[in-house]
Protein backbone atom coordinates (compact mmCIF):
# COMPACT_ATOMS: atom_id res chain seq x y z
CA UNK A 1 0.00 0.00 0.00
CA UNK A 2 1.22 3.48 -0.85
CA UNK A 3 0.87 5.44 2.39
CA UNK A 4 1.64 8.71 0.62
CA UNK A 5 -1.53 8.23 -1.45
CA UNK A 6 -3.51 7.22 1.62
CA UNK A 7 -2.61 10.52 3.29
CA UNK A 8 -2.88 12.52 0.06
CA UNK A 9 0.83 13.39 -0.12
CA UNK A 10 3.10 13.44 -3.13
CA UNK A 11 5.71 10.74 -2.47
CA UNK A 12 8.62 12.63 -0.93
CA UNK A 13 11.04 12.22 1.94
CA UNK A 14 10.37 15.74 3.17
CA UNK A 15 6.75 16.03 4.30
CA UNK A 16 4.83 18.37 6.56
CA UNK A 17 4.42 16.28 9.72
CA UNK A 18 1.86 18.72 11.12
CA UNK A 19 -0.30 18.19 8.05
CA UNK A 20 0.31 14.45 8.37
CA UNK A 21 -1.07 14.51 11.93
CA UNK A 22 -4.09 16.53 10.78
CA UNK A 23 -4.86 14.09 7.96
CA UNK A 24 -4.35 11.17 10.34
CA UNK A 25 -7.03 12.52 12.68
CA UNK A 26 -9.39 13.05 9.73
CA UNK A 27 -8.85 9.52 8.43
CA UNK A 28 -9.25 8.06 11.92
CA UNK A 29 -12.63 9.74 12.24
CA UNK A 30 -13.71 8.49 8.81
CA UNK A 31 -12.76 4.83 9.31
CA UNK A 32 -13.17 4.34 13.06
CA UNK A 33 -14.88 0.99 13.75
CA UNK A 34 -17.45 2.63 16.07
CA UNK A 35 -18.95 4.37 13.03
CA UNK A 36 -19.77 0.93 11.65
CA UNK A 37 -21.22 -0.62 14.82
CA UNK A 38 -24.64 -1.17 13.21
CA UNK A 39 -23.28 -2.43 9.89
CA UNK A 40 -22.60 -5.97 8.72
CA UNK A 41 -19.75 -8.03 10.13
CA UNK A 42 -17.94 -7.60 6.82
CA UNK A 43 -18.20 -3.80 7.08
CA UNK A 44 -16.95 -3.94 10.67
CA UNK A 45 -13.99 -6.06 9.62
CA UNK A 46 -13.19 -3.66 6.77
CA UNK A 47 -13.30 -0.74 9.21
CA UNK A 48 -10.85 -2.51 11.52
CA UNK A 49 -8.54 -3.24 8.56
CA UNK A 50 -8.72 0.36 7.32
CA UNK A 51 -7.99 1.64 10.81
CA UNK A 52 -4.93 -0.63 10.99
CA UNK A 53 -3.75 0.66 7.58
CA UNK A 54 -4.21 4.26 8.66
CA UNK A 55 -2.30 3.63 11.90
CA UNK A 56 0.53 1.82 10.14
CA UNK A 57 0.68 4.47 7.44
CA UNK A 58 0.82 7.27 9.97
CA UNK A 59 3.63 5.67 11.96
CA UNK A 60 5.52 4.85 8.77
CA UNK A 61 5.33 8.39 7.40
CA UNK A 62 5.90 10.04 10.78
CA UNK A 63 9.29 8.40 11.35
CA UNK A 64 11.93 9.58 8.85
CA UNK A 65 13.77 6.27 8.61
CA UNK A 66 10.58 4.27 8.04
CA UNK A 67 9.39 6.93 5.58
CA UNK A 68 12.62 6.56 3.61
CA UNK A 69 12.28 2.78 3.54
CA UNK A 70 8.69 3.09 2.33
CA UNK A 71 9.69 5.56 -0.37
CA UNK A 72 12.49 3.25 -1.50
CA UNK A 73 10.14 0.25 -1.59
CA UNK A 74 7.76 2.23 -3.81
CA UNK A 75 10.77 2.85 -6.07
CA UNK A 76 11.60 -0.87 -6.22
CA UNK A 77 14.30 -1.00 -3.52
CA UNK A 78 13.04 -3.28 -0.75
CA UNK A 79 14.99 -3.20 2.51
CA UNK A 80 12.52 -5.26 4.56
CA UNK A 81 14.57 -8.47 4.37
CA UNK A 82 17.91 -6.75 4.25
CA UNK A 83 21.11 -8.78 4.10
CA UNK A 84 23.38 -6.28 2.34
CA UNK A 85 26.26 -4.97 4.41
CA UNK A 86 27.73 -1.49 4.45
CA UNK A 87 30.75 -1.20 2.16
CA UNK A 88 31.76 2.39 2.96
CA UNK A 89 35.21 1.94 4.55
CA UNK A 90 35.26 5.43 6.08
CA UNK A 91 31.93 4.75 7.79
CA UNK A 92 33.12 1.31 8.90
CA UNK A 93 36.23 2.85 10.48
CA UNK A 94 34.06 5.44 12.23
CA UNK A 95 31.81 2.61 13.39
CA UNK A 96 34.81 0.87 14.98
CA UNK A 97 35.83 4.11 16.71
CA UNK A 98 32.33 4.55 18.10
CA UNK A 99 32.24 0.96 19.32
CA UNK A 100 35.56 1.47 21.12
CA UNK A 101 34.24 4.70 22.64
CA UNK A 102 31.14 2.87 23.89
CA UNK A 103 33.35 0.26 25.50
CA UNK A 104 35.61 2.93 27.05
CA UNK A 105 32.63 4.52 28.81
CA UNK A 106 32.27 1.44 30.99
CA UNK A 107 35.78 1.99 32.39
CA UNK A 108 35.77 5.77 32.53
CA UNK A 109 36.02 7.97 35.61
CA UNK A 110 33.97 10.64 33.78
CA UNK A 111 31.42 8.54 31.89
CA UNK A 112 28.78 11.26 31.55
CA UNK A 113 31.20 13.53 29.72
CA UNK A 114 31.99 10.76 27.23
CA UNK A 115 28.31 9.91 26.88
CA UNK A 116 27.49 13.54 26.07
CA UNK A 117 30.31 13.69 23.51
CA UNK A 118 29.06 10.53 21.83
CA UNK A 119 25.48 11.78 21.75
CA UNK A 120 26.75 14.95 20.06
CA UNK A 121 28.86 12.96 17.60
CA UNK A 122 25.97 10.61 16.76
CA UNK A 123 23.56 13.51 16.37
CA UNK A 124 25.86 15.42 14.01
CA UNK A 125 26.49 12.33 11.89
CA UNK A 126 22.79 11.43 11.75
CA UNK A 127 21.94 14.97 10.69
CA UNK A 128 24.44 14.71 7.83
CA UNK A 129 23.13 11.29 6.78
CA UNK A 130 19.51 12.47 6.81
CA UNK A 131 20.45 15.52 4.72
CA UNK A 132 22.20 13.32 2.16
CA UNK A 133 19.28 10.88 2.20
CA UNK A 134 16.79 13.66 1.53
CA UNK A 135 18.85 14.87 -1.43
CA UNK A 136 19.20 11.36 -2.89
CA UNK A 137 15.48 10.63 -2.57
CA UNK A 138 14.62 13.83 -4.45
CA UNK A 139 16.51 12.53 -7.49
CA UNK A 140 14.24 9.49 -7.90
CA UNK A 141 16.47 7.44 -10.15
CA UNK A 142 17.77 3.93 -9.61
CA UNK A 143 21.38 4.88 -8.82
CA UNK A 144 20.27 7.55 -6.33
CA UNK A 145 17.85 5.10 -4.70
CA UNK A 146 20.60 2.49 -4.29
CA UNK A 147 22.79 5.15 -2.66
CA UNK A 148 19.83 6.19 -0.51
CA UNK A 149 19.47 2.56 0.58
CA UNK A 150 23.08 2.69 1.80
CA UNK A 151 22.22 5.82 3.79
CA UNK A 152 19.27 4.00 5.35
CA UNK A 153 21.57 1.12 6.33
CA UNK A 154 23.93 3.61 7.99
CA UNK A 155 21.06 5.32 9.78
CA UNK A 156 19.80 1.97 11.06
CA UNK A 157 23.26 1.32 12.43
CA UNK A 158 23.27 4.77 14.02
CA UNK A 159 19.91 4.02 15.66
CA UNK A 160 21.39 0.83 17.15
CA UNK A 161 24.38 2.78 18.45
CA UNK A 162 22.08 5.39 19.98
CA UNK A 163 20.16 2.61 21.73
CA UNK A 164 23.37 1.04 23.04
CA UNK A 165 24.51 4.41 24.36
CA UNK A 166 21.14 4.95 26.04
CA UNK A 167 21.38 1.49 27.62
CA UNK A 168 24.88 2.25 28.93
CA UNK A 169 23.70 5.57 30.35
CA UNK A 170 20.68 3.93 31.98
CA UNK A 171 22.91 1.24 33.52
CA UNK A 172 25.16 3.92 35.01
CA UNK A 173 22.15 5.64 36.58
CA UNK A 174 20.91 2.42 38.22
Swiss-Prot record:
PROSITE patterns: DNAJ_2. One of its GO terms (molecular function) is ATPase activator activity. One of its GO terms (biological process) is [2Fe-2S] cluster assembly. GO terms for cellular component: iron-sulfur cluster transfer complex. CDD domains: DnaJ (cd06257). Residues 2-74 form the J domain. Keywords: Chaperone. Belongs to the HscB family. Interacts with HscA and stimulates its ATPase activity. PANTHER family: IRON-SULFUR CLUSTER CO-CHAPERONE PROTEIN HSCB. Co-chaperone involved in the maturation of iron-sulfur cluster-containing proteins. Seems to help targeting proteins to be folded toward HscA. This is Co-chaperone protein HscB homolog. It comes from Shewanella denitrificans (strain OS217 / ATCC BAA-1090 / DSM 15013). The gene is hscB.
Amino acid sequence: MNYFNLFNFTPSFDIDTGLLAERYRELQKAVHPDKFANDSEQQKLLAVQRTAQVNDGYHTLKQPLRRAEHLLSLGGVDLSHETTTIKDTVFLMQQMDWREALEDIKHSKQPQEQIDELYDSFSAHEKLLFSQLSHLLQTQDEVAYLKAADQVRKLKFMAKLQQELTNIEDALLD
